[in-house]
Regions:
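A detector for small-residue-rich transmembrane helices and their helix-helix packing motifs
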Residues: 1-228
Length: 228
């Protein structure tokens, strides 16, 4: 008897990314130390390891975090995998994830330099106040996790290539060409004006979209329908 795949029309690379993300999420909840080993830390932190540049993309903070990212991957990924082909889609996903982390690291480096006058913490450095101390503790001691940078890269690709596709925001249809810029503006605002307790790496989201834009232009893709 023929049994339909539970993944339906999900394309191969997207399917494998989903499986790997779920495996990592389960493993990190069963073995909590993986959260420290596989999250991405600021390069000057003693917790930083080279593999984190890739592994952080498969780590998620909670069920809502992984659910929202994987939902974006399911909705956008198959369209782009069919557009790019499997190999290029795979490369795009990881390159935008790395680009996202690069911008987040650059912002962290700027913040550290503003406080210490260096991109690290000098041996004789003494914080001027509690705010400086807490900022440095956050940068050095809290890892970055999630596929969001890559998902924002996918969003940028959809925006550039299929701007008239619609998504539903609170049951209201809105075209990609409006939704993505508004979402990115919100990320820029939240990144520049962070609120207390906000643990989201907004500049990683912006970095994923920015590197996605660069890749689409370098690869010579153009939108496949009228932008307006």
């Amino acid at each position: 008897m023929y049994r339909q795949s539970p993944f339906g029309d999900i394309t191969p690379v997207v399917k494998n990314l989903l499986i790997i993300n779920v495996i990592f999420f389960i493993a990190s909840n069963v073995i909590p130390v993986l959260n420290e080993i596989l999250a991405a830390y600021y390069p000057a932190s003693p917790l930083f390891k080279p593999w984190q540049i890739i592994s952080y993309m498969f780590m998620h903070g909670n069920i809502f975090h992984i659910f929202s990212n994987m939902l974006g991957l399911i909705f956008i990924g198959p369209i782009l995998e069919q557009t790019f082909g499997q190999k290029r889609f795979f490369n795009y996903y990881f390159l935008t994830g790395i680009g996202a982390l690069a911008l987040q690291f650059a912002v962290q480096a700027y913040e550290v330099h503003q406080i210490t006058g260096s991109f690290g913490i000098p041996a004789d450095y003494q914080p001027k106040d509690m705010s400086e101390s807490l900022t440095l503790q956050s940068i050095y001691g809290i890892g970055i996790v999630g596929a969001s940078g890559s998902i924002f890269g996918l969003m940028m690709a959809i925006f550039l290539l299929y701007p008239n596709l619609e998504v539903y925001l609170y049951l209201t249809p809105i075209k990609i060409k409006y939704f993505v810029p508004l979402y990115l503006l919100l990320e820029v605002f939240q990144g520049l004006r962070p609120t207390p307790g906000d643990s989201v790496a907004h500049f990683a989201h912006i970095g994923g979209a920015l590197f996605g834009f660069i890749l689409i232009k370098l690869w010579g893709y153009k939108n496949s329908n009228n932008f307006y």
